[in-house]
Amino acid sequence: MSQTTNSYDSFQDADLCSAAFAEKQDEKDKLTKLREDFYIPTKGDLINKKYGFQKSGNNAKGHENGKCIYFCGNSLGLQPTRTKEYINRYLDTWASKGVFGHFTDYEGGLPPWLHIDDAVKEQTSKIVGALPSEVVIMETLTANLHLLMSSFYRPTKDRWKIIIEGKAFPSDHYAALSQIAHHDLDPSALITIEPPSSSAPYLSNEHILSVISKHAATTALVLLPGIQFYSGQFFDIELITRHCRALGITVGWDLAHAVGNVPLKLHDWNVDFAAWCNYKYMSGGPGVIGGAFVHERHGTVGETAPTTTPDGTNGNPKTISDESLTYRPRLSGWWGNDKSSRFTMDNKFVPIPGASGYQLSNPSALDMTSVMASLDVFALTTMDALRERSIRLTGYLEARLLRYPGGEPPYTIITPTNPAERGAQLSVMLRPGMLDSVLHHLEKEGVVVDERKPDVLRIAPAPLYNTFRDVHDFIGIFHEACRKALVKPAEAPKHSEGVPKAIQTT
């Protein structure tokens, strides 16, 4: 990753901190218009105790008609306006065509459900930097990690360890430990990369590589996050992958916080496998179907086995052979079977080449439709263009956070300062005891961010729908919240009436 600096550091406070400055940034950015492709809840919507939108007008207080400031796309992305239309088309097809919706391409409809998983490959591959054959939309994140590890974690008497990041999201930790237990290995086979000191908020490349090197001779798999969920650190996927492969170690990536957030080049970086969810920056909907990547060298199906090392390391274990077919071992299901023989019911598994051969069951057409709606929004631009906007948007947020009126801010940004080492998210650690009071004020003013007990706010302006004016307005509200928390921290209720507790999911 190249070193870059925040382009807003050189601006004078009087210019940078004005509403006019923020509005000018929005006016000259062509991607600002993408906000129109999303539903932005109003402040009244957030406090309304009935489901759905609050009706604007005389019954609503004036400030409640204003749009909320939604900086929580790192937890759940906002809904694209086209999602409802797409899902209605799916429902209408099901209602009017029944089972024929599986096989027939109807005018004005969505792709037949039999092929809907193929229909999302092209755009998905652009977002993660892969060949279409290397990606598949299926299952959910942890399920996909288990499916992929069942294929790629092949412990031997010489290599049996899994290396993960010490502060990994708990589900990744559970998955790795349970895979170790599944192979009847001791929990000590799990190696965690811990910060070198308690004062270090994130991991340097040098430290990550040194831990991997230390355990290289006995390590079968490295599983790391593309972006760390708590600190927002963007790991150097290319560098770490190259290091692992040079040491004969299979490497997989959890891209939950990276997909749709930063440009990826999984194919060119020679990543072995990866998995992600589609409900954060991808805006596919809560708990929607996830995605997986398998490099083409691992997805071959044919008469010649993939190149292997003598002990089957480096992600290439001995292959399964079934009547002259050779392919990588995996947990198999009928939807991963070649389409030409999927319905012959002869019990001979012929995997689809590539990532699709890892599918188990037919995917939910409802979920796929929701993901398709999101992908069609991403198709309006490119990941490089979104990244350029995101760097400026988050850089503006950082510059404004560092300009605290009245002296030293009562918080610290624990996300890397180098824009190349982070995505959209900035994690802000408040002084002890401030969190509940600050959240109370933010929620009252229609600001949605994510909390991490005991003291951290994760603030993530999404380039698809957030604006510089959002950031400007947020800073005023946040700084006022901090001032109130410092003066009378104990008087604020823990959470305001009618507003859900700040989102706890990732």
Curated annotation (Swiss-Prot):
N6-(pyridoxal phosphate)lysine, modified sites: 280
Stretch list, region Disordered: 303-322
InterPro entries per UniProt: Aminotrans_V_dom, Kynureninase, PyrdxlP-dep_Trfase, PyrdxlP-dep_Trfase_major, PyrdxlP-dep_Trfase_small
Protein name according to UniProt: Kynureninase 1
Root EC class: hydrolase
Positions with biased composition (Low complexity): 303-319
Pathway membership: Amino-acid degradation; L-kynurenine degradation; L-alanine and anthranilate from L-kynurenine: step 1/1; Cofactor biosynthesis; NAD(+) biosynthesis; quinolinate from L-kynurenine: step 2/3
The reaction(s) this protein catalyses: L-kynurenine + H2O = anthranilate + L-alanine + H(+); 3-hydroxy-L-kynurenine + H2O = 3-hydroxyanthranilate + L-alanine + H(+)
Positions of pyridoxal 5'-phosphate binding: 141-142, 169-172, 254, 257, 279, 334, 362
Quaternary data: Homodimer.
EC number(s) from the headed UniProt entry: 3.7.1.3
GO biological process, one term: anthranilate metabolic process
Keyword annotations from UniProtKB, A to Z: Cytoplasm, Hydrolase, Pyridine nucleotide biosynthesis, Pyridoxal phosphate
Gene assigned in the entry: BNA5-1
UniProt source species: Phaeosphaeria nodorum (strain SN15 / ATCC MYA-4574 / FGSC 10173) (Glume blotch fungus)
GO cellular component: cytoplasm
